[in-house]
Amino acid sequence: MFQGSIVAIVTPFKNGAVDEEKLRELVEFQIENGTDAIVPCGTTGESSTLSYVEHDRVIQVVVEQVNKRVPVIAGTGSNSTHEAIEITQHAKELGADGALLVTPYYNKPSQEGLFRHYKAVADAVALPQILYNVPGRTGVNLLPETVARLSVHQNIVAIKEATGSLQQASEVLALCGDKIDVLSGDDFITLPIMAAGGKGVISVTANIMPKEVSSLVDAFNAGNMEEARRLHLYLLKISNAMFIESNPVPVKAAVSLMGKCSSEVRLPLAPLMEANLAKLTAIMKEYKLI
């Protein structure tokens, strides 16, 4: 259902507030450059430091600006199941086409707890939902066996697999078959995951190089493996640079260097350290982005 190059879009700020004008411009930049779907309020969108009102407004602005040209998949995860249901319902009411739900963080539920959490949200809200597994940030790993149990639910359509493990993504594919789509959550293994049967990527790098990320996915889907491999290797350095510090600090700095919005992040995130900013600037010059 949700396939291709999907951007986890940044949330631009200006003097502490959401910069709606720049957000709309970023949406246009994505659509003009071939992005297949947009995820507002994900990790890259700093959802954890948005108020409930801001969270809803960011989704609303993106839905309005997209105007049905591509799917909008709203980040609606929470470590409270009740809250996740409420946020997902709000996203549906605002016109989102789907929801991306990160595994509950900090409270470290068991696999049974994870299963019940996701099932409860999927039972409560009739909206296509993407599981989001990123144990490096949440402290819990959604195992392939649990994904397989969830994959039979009609409202659970995909998983963003961001363990960085090709083995785990492959195990999900082996266990679930065509019952659920697997999307890479790490730009640097998009091509390997697609080669194993994945359907695309939810990308950080696409914030600054949407055309190239989209072209990689399109080349693979067209059977042009030589071009897909070339783009995969070409994008490795810039994709790795997006994690020179915690996401989304580097990508926001990169977008700012391109003149598209402020690099402003919200505490407890801090601006990119000067030494890392110098490294990022040099890499972006190599790619002729600035």
From Swiss-Prot:
The keyword Cell division does not apply. Its EC number is 4.3.3.7. It comes from the Bacteria. InterPro entries: Aldolase_TIM, DapA, DapA-like, Schiff_base-form_aldolases_AS, Schiff_base-form_aldolases_CS. The active site is at 132 (proton donor/acceptor), 160 (schiff-base intermediate with substrate). The keyword Transcription does not apply. It catalyses: L-aspartate 4-semialdehyde + pyruvate = (2S,4S)-4-hydroxy-2,3,4,5-tetrahydrodipicolinate + H2O + H(+). GO terms for cellular component: cytosol. Catalyzes the condensation of (S)-aspartate-beta-semialdehyde [(S)-ASA] and pyruvate to 4-hydroxy-tetrahydrodipicolinate (HTPA). HAMAP family: DapA. This is 4-hydroxy-tetrahydrodipicolinate synthase. It comes from Citrifermentans bemidjiense (strain ATCC BAA-1014 / DSM 16622 / JCM 12645 / Bem) (Geobacter bemidjiensis).
